[in-house]
Structure formats: C-alpha cells, structure tokens
Amino acid sequence: MTNKLFEGGSMPGVGPIHINEIEPTLDALEKVLGINLKDNVLGSVGKKEFSGDIDVAVQVAPEDIPQLVKKIEASPLVLDMAKSSVIMTKVKIVDYDQSKQTTKPRTGFVQIDFMPGDPGWMKTYYHSPSQEESKYKGVFRNLMIATICAMLDRKSSEEKIDDGRPVEVERWMWSPSDGLVRVKRTPAPRKDGKGFTKKNVDVRIQEPIKDPSAIAKALKLNTAKDLNSYESLKAAIEQNYPQDMVDKILASFAKNGTVRDIGVPDDIPVEEPKTESLADKQLNRIKELLK
C-alpha cells in the first residue's frame, strides 16, 4: 500500500460508484473499522445513480486518528491511502457491476475520504439536495448561505482605515468546522505597528449555532427546510427579507467566481459589462478634447 499525498486530492485508478454498490461497500468497511459509515455519508452520495467519490464524516479524537489509520490500512478492501486534512483511500467496490457505466470511466475502485469531525454538523454543512429537489449542486446552496451570512445583520463602524475597510464589523460566518458563528472582524495590524495588513482578525462573540432549526431562526428564515437548496433559500429570503436586501444578496451571489464558472442560475438577472464601440470611443474622446 502506498501512503502519500496525491496532487489535487485524487487517488489514482479510481472511478464512480453506482448507487446499488454503495451500501455493500460501506458494510464491508464497517465490519473492519467498527464504526458507522452509512449514516454519516456527506453531500450527494446515495442521492443520484452514480457518485464520483464518497465522503464520510468520522467522529474521532485527534489523538485516536493514528489508530484509525492503522485499521484502515489493515482492511483488504483498501489498496491505497493518502493523508492530508482528510484520510483519502482507494477502495475496492463490493458487488461491482461492470454493466453499469456512466460518462466517466469505471474502474472497480472508488475513492472514499474519511473526514474527522462532528458528523451531525458536517452532514448539515456538506448537505447536497437530490436531483429532484434542485437543479444545482450543494456548492450553490453553501455559497448562498455564505452570501446571506455576509450581508444579513451586518454592522459596520463608520470609521474606516486607509484602504476603506471599516475599523470594526459584526457579521455572521458560515464555518465548515464551527457552525453558524457571529464574529467581530477587525483589520489585522502590521507587526511594526504601522498600519494594517490586508488580512482580517475574526473574534467569536456568540456561541456557535449548529442546530438547523436554530440556524434558520438566526438567519430569519422560516424553518430548517429552507436550508435545503439554492431554490429553497432564494424563496425564503424573497419571502422574509426587504427587497433591497434580496437584490444585494443575489447580486453578490451572481458575482462569485465559482458561481460564474459553473453558470449563474437562470432566475438571477446578470448585468453584462457595457462595451464601447470604436465609434463611441472616438466620439467620447472628441467630447473630452472640446471641454
């Protein structure tokens, strides 16, 4: 077995797994590891016919991770392993059905990433709606929540530093490890005491919120169901927020680089940058000269 970090977080020789193969594969691993895996899968696993990989949340103390790694290494199903912030493995698919194929090549092996942390919270944070519930992947849902957090109940000081940042901001943050967190953000001072760096310092000012119902209440939504997808979030803010706040959130969401790369949802109007024709440029230049 190799034990190194592969570039891009991807193990060699792995491919998609069919939905019917997920349970027997995880069953076999559960017997070896002695931990619940099936109830702690993250994202869209099991919600569509094929999954590119499997992410599993594992409740394990930091000091017990080496022991978990040894158990994983000992499994005959695990052919390769790499460690970073997660434990990445190449696992033999149990009951592999070669007749089931998809757009990406299938190899009989799937990547399973073991992610140490709080399974309950990670299932909330990494939640991905089913294909019947949303046209968009879970990343859109998370980016929408993060955009709401950046703007809802944001309190900025009138005083600003030289680069235009407020001296102090109170805001929500959507944290993959801590939950929904209320923080006080200040510009990070330079070590020499002369001004500030481009970084910020976030100090938690309230206890983190991890319960979905409490998160929905803090974000002034209706119920935890509103957190399900991009569509449910958009409908909830349109129902509960002032129109100017809705417009700001949707405009900021549409400008996000990841959203633009994947494709801005059809129900958000996108302002295309205005382009000047050569004739317009020449006319404007003449007007400038005549001033």
Write out the residue ranges for each language-model feature:
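Intrinsically disordered, compositionally biased, charge-dense segments
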Residues: 1, 7, 266-291
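Helical scaffold of the NTase/Pol beta-like nucleotidyltransferase catalytic core
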Residues: 1-42
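Intrinsically disordered, low-complexity eukaryotic regions enriched in glycine, serine
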Residues: 29-32, 60, 81-88, 256, ...
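Short secondary-structure junctions
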Residues: 33-42, 68-88, 154-163, 169
